[in-house]
Structures are given as C-alpha cells and as structure tokens.
Design a protein with these regions (language model features):
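Transmembrane beta-strands of outer-membrane beta-barrel pores
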Residues: 7-9, 16-22, 35-37, 50-54, ...
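Transmembrane beta-strands of outer-membrane beta-barrel proteins
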Residues: 12-14, 42-46, 109-111, 159-163, ...
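Outer-membrane beta-barrel translocator/channel fold
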Residues: 1, 43-107, 115, 194-224
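Outer-membrane beta-barrel channels and translocator barrels
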Residues: 7-10, 38-40, 104-106, 155-157, ...
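Residues that define the transmembrane beta-barrel architecture of outer-membrane proteins
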Residues: 6, 25-29, 89-95, 138-146, ...
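Outer membrane beta-barrel transmembrane domains
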Residues: 116, 121-151, 169-180, 184, ...
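Extracellular loop and loop/strand-boundary signature of outer-membrane beta-barrel proteins
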Residues: 15-19, 30-34, 79-85, 94-96, ...
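Residues on the lipid-exposed face of transmembrane beta-strands in outer-membrane beta-barrel proteins
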Residues: 3-5, 31-35, 97-101, 146-152, ...
Length: 224
C-alpha cells in the first residue's frame, strides 16, 4: 500500500508492506519527504522506514510445524553452551538523506547518505559452519553508506552516461565498494536500451574464520 501527495514544491509519501513466507513474517512502514528548490534544479529528500520481522525455523521431521528462531547466546553458566536468545523479532530502522542537482541542461548529479540500525536474529537458521555448529551472528548491526552518481546526456548521439559509486561500512567490520557504469541509448522513439556494468568488493566480518572452523567458545560464527 502506497500513498503520495504533492503541494507546490513539497512531496510527501508513505507506504505499508506486509509479506509472509513459510518461516518468515515481515511488516514495513515508511515515510518520505522531498522539496524542490531554485526553480526545480535542486531536490532535497529524506526517507525513513521501519521493518518488524519475525523469524521461524521449520522442523525437518515435523511437517507444518515451525518454531521461533531466536538466534543463540552463550549460557551464563557455560560459555560453550549456547541457548536461545531473547526474541525472534528483527527490528530494522533505515533512514536516508538525498541531494539531487541539475547542474546543466545535460548533467544531473546526486548524493545520498543512508544509515541502518538492526537488532534481532540476523543469521540463517538452517546454515551451519564447516565443523557442524550453527551460525551465530551479533544481534546488533549498524551500517552507514554513502553513494553518488551523475547522469550526462549526449543529445546528438541519443546517449546518456551514468557513473555511480557506493561505499558502506558497519560495526561488524565489513567495508564495501561498488562502482558502476550505465549506458542508456535511445535507439528508436519507442525503444531504449540500457547496458550496465557493476563491480563489487568487500572484506570479511571481524568474526569470520578463513578456514570455516570455529571453537566451541567462539561467540560468533558465520558460514559466509
């Protein structure tokens, strides 16, 4: 469900989304606000979304039965004994600020800053590490991303070039770089083609093991 409204230079929007799978339920709500400035050559925007998910695990030998997946935390009595966490709810807050600027008749530039705060189970309940133990990820993840793009039109050639770049970092120690190049071509008045190349690279999380093996006392484990 999506609602949008416009009043002069202001634009306001909101949405609600519900989705469900056999072992997952998700509800999301969001708001967006934008304003145009300087004869519509500049647009400032802000967005916020909240997601409330519930994770479950299907029991392999009991058809139709699922149990809440609450991740795992070390027992207070024995750090090698992992017990269920406090909840199967994953709450995610996403917020972003955007800036678009028409610099010339043929050049548009954009800049966006995004932040997210996720709390709750975030691993795959069915996946195990190499030595057979369940995945265990931190219950909290905070991420910040910065992205920029430009779109340059070549009217005589009916082409537009669109370079993009995105960088993100989180408190798991993951850093990502994603440069991208898009080419838009108007072949016919009613036909346009687009070619895209994207390169993506990231480092591993701080708790990742290059061998895939973990000790029983390791607080976090991942099979990625």
């Amino acid at each position: 469900l999506r609602v949008a409204s416009r009043l002069r230079e202001w634009s306001l929007g909101s949405f609600f989304r519900y989705s469900t799978e056999t072992d997952y339920e998700s509800r999301s709500v969001g708001l967006s606000l934008a304003r145009e400035l300087r004869q519509k050559t500049i647009t400032l925007g802000a967005n916020y979304a909240y997601t409330h998910d519930r994770a479950f695990r299907i029991l392999a030998n009991v058809p139709g039965v699922r149990i809440p997946w609450k991740s795992k935390v070390p027992s207070e009595d024995d750090p090698t004994d992992f017990v269920d966490g406090p909840t199967n709810v994953l709450q995610v807050h996403n917020a972003s600020l955007g800036y678009n600027h028409v610099l010339t008749r043929t050049l548009l530039a954009s800049l966006q800053v995004e932040g997210s705060h996720a709390r709750g189970p975030q691993e795959n309940p069915y996946r195990r590490v190499r030595n057979g133990m369940e995945e265990v990820h931190p219950l909290l993840r905070r991420r910040l991303a910065v992205s920029g793009s430009a779109r340059y039109a070549i009217p005589k050639a009916r082409l537009a070039l669109e370079p993009r770049y995105r960088f993100s970092a989180d408190d798991w120690g993951v850093r990502t770089h994603a440069p991208q190049l898009r080419l838009h071509a108007r072949v016919l008045p009613e036909l346009s083609l687009r070619a895209r190349y994207r390169y993506y690279i990231q480092n591993a999380a701080e708790f990742w093991s290059p061998t895939g093996d973990y000790a029983a006392t390791d607080r976090y484990r991942t099979a990625d």
